C-alpha cells in the first residue's frame, strides 16, 4: 500500500535538564519554566504520587514558597504542567500529519502520533487525562485541551470553532477515532499488549499492530 504521507520523524523526547543549584537566581518567568521542568522530571521518574509542591521546589533547587507563589497549590502546578503537555501533544500530532493527502492517511498519522506521544511521555500523558487532579477553569489548560481536540476533529474533516454544535454523526466519528487511539495507548502503557505482541511474528511491535488496526502505513521509527 503506497503511503500518502511522508514518514514523520520520531518526535524527540523532551530534553531533561539537570537540577539547578539552589543558589542560582531565577528571573520570574524563568522560575516558572524551571518549576514546570522540575515537575515533569518528578512525574516521569516518581509518578503523580511523588509530585508535590515541596518536591518540585527541591528538584528545582528553589525555596519551598516558590511554587506556591506561581501555581497556588499542587493542583495548579499539575494543571499548568498538563497544559504544557497538551500544547506539545497538539504540535506532535500536527507535525505527524502535515504531509498527508487524504483523510484516512491523516487519521492514521495522527493515531501513530497520539500513541507515540504516550509511549515517550507516559507520566505526562496520564496526567493530561486525570480530570480529578486538574483544574480546567485555568485558561491555559482549557485552551490547550480544546486545541488538542480540534486537531483530532480536523483530521476527520470537521472544521469549526470549539463551541460549534456537532451533528450526531460527526460526534460519533470523533469519539470512535479518539476511543480507538486512546484505548490503545492506555493498553500499551499498562503492558496489556505485550502478551499479544509476543505471539506475533518477529519484527512486529505495538506500533505495527496499531498500523494494522488503523489501516494506514506504519511510519519509520
Language model region names:
Residues 1-46, 54-55, 59, 76-79:
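Basic, helix-initiating cap at the start of DNA-binding domains
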Residues 1-3, 7-10, 156-157, 187, ...:
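Intrinsic, short, N-terminal disordered tails of RNA polymerase sigma-factor systems
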Residues 29-37, 44, 49-50, 70-94, ...:
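An amphipathic alpha-helix adjacent to DNA-recognition modules
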Residues 61-71:
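Short hydrophobic/aromatic patch on the recognition helix
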Residues 84-107, 139-147, 160-163:
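Amphipathic alpha-helical linker/stalk segments
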Residues 95, 128-135, 194-195:
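Short linear capping/connector segments at secondary-structure termini
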Residues 136-142, 146, 159-211, 220-221:
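Hydrophobic/aromatic-rich alpha-helical bundle segments in the mid-to-C-terminal region
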Amino acid at each position: 500500500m503506497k503511503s500518502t504521507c511522508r514518514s514523520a520523524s520520531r518526535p524527540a523526547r523532551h530534553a531533561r535538564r539537570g537540577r539547578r543549584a539552589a543558589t542560582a537566581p531565577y528571573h520570574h518567568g524563568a522560575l516558572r519554566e524551571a518549576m514546570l521542568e522540575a515537575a515533569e522530571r518528578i512525574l516521569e521518574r516518581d509518578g503523580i504520587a511523588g509530585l508535590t509542591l515541596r518536591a518540585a521546589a527541591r528538584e528545582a533547587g528553589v525555596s519551598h514558597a516558590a511554587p506556591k507563589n506561581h501555581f497556588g497549590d499542587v493542583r495548579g502546578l499539575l494543571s499548568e504542567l498538563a497544559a504544557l503537555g497538551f500544547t506539545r501533544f497538539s504540535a506532535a500530532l500536527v507535525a505527524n500529519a502535515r504531509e498527508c493527502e487524504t483523510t484516512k492517511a491523516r487519521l492514521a498519522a495522527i493515531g501513530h502520533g497520539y500513541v507515540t506521544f504516550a509511549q515517550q511521555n507516559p507520566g505526562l500523558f496520564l496526567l493530561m487525562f486525570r480530570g480529578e487532579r486538574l483544574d480546567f477553569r485555568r485558561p491555559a489548560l482549557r485552551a490547550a485541551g480544546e486545541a488538542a481536540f480540534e486537531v483530532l476533529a480536523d483530521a476527520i474533516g470537521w472544521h469549526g470553532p470549539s463551541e460549534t454544535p456537532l451533528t450526531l454523526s460527526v460526534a460519533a466519528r470523533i469519539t470512535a477515532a479518539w476511543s480507538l487511539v486512546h484505548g490503545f495507548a492506555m493498553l500499551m502503557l499498562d503492558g496489556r499488549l505485550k502478551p499479544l505482541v509476543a505471539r506475533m511474528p518477529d519484527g512486529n511491535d505495538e506500533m505495527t499492530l496499531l498500523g494494522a488496526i488503523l489501516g494506514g502505513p506504519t511510519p519509520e521509527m
